[in-house]
Amino acid sequence: MATYKGIQGFTIQNLSADPSNFEEGQVWYNSTSNVWKVTDVATVGSWATGNNLNTARKQLAGAGTQTEALAFGGANPPAVMLDSTEEYNGTSWTSNPTGLNTARRGLEGCGIQTAALAFGGELNPQPTNSSSTEEYNGATWTTIPPGLNTARANLGGCGTQTAGLAFGGGPSITGATEEYNGTSWATNPTGLNTARQFLGGTGTQTAGLAFGGNPGSPPFNTTATEEYDGSTWTSNPTGLNTARRFFTGTGIQTAAVAFGGYIDPSATNTGATELYDGSTWTSSPASMNTARNGLGSAGTQSAALGFGGEPVTAATEEWTGPGALVTKTITVS
């Protein structure tokens, strides 16, 4: 009788824990859980519930990756603006006692856990827009004056701490676009083709993506998608499948994921998830477990993180996109 070793040339590993680095088709026996396991490629995406934020909030910002994420700012009812900052390690959130210098909601962020950027937002008393820009070094936030040239809230953004991009926002709805060089913001006279607030954004300063949002006129939600090349915005005639506002997204211009938000005319929250390939949006059969708007995000199209949101929640969810390697338990069925 043929054996696995004879066919493959090696024996199956006996491990007390699943390996942190694995390859497609790798098989092992987990001696702790007493099951056989294999690594396979996910054919569709899926959401899994993670550990909650320490501070429940809405209209917060995020940065980083699925295993090294950052959550900051936001609000708790009725209108308490937050400066609190939390770091995620792939399992749990840890609060940093040193928060933002300017507590606010409806702000935007970009960068990584140890080098993040926060900008814009809404202050008390409402409605007071903020232009404040802060840099995070993994421990503390530093305010960088003078901030955005156009103070605004509920804007889109993307990029890094030294090459950021801000676009759109409200409540006086704008398409204004600004670029950050690590020291100051410069206004690009060419703004979004569709001015809007409560939009999603992701990518880099020279390859940005703007999608969805509220253009300020009925039906108040748009599917509009635009790509930025470092100079101008180009509208993609193929927009989102679900028009929405107050949602989020992450990834790059050619591989993005959008999720959550608020939809009309049903006036309900959604957990709908869509994938962008640089040309078209495709609706995923998998929706978030907790439908919500005003949430934060981090990560990539294949490994994203969604957290917080409204109704005010601390819920965290991890997204595994199609094509990602996943661990499965081998059964006889």
Where are these regions (language model features)?
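Polar, enzyme-active/binding microenvironments
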Residues: 1-333
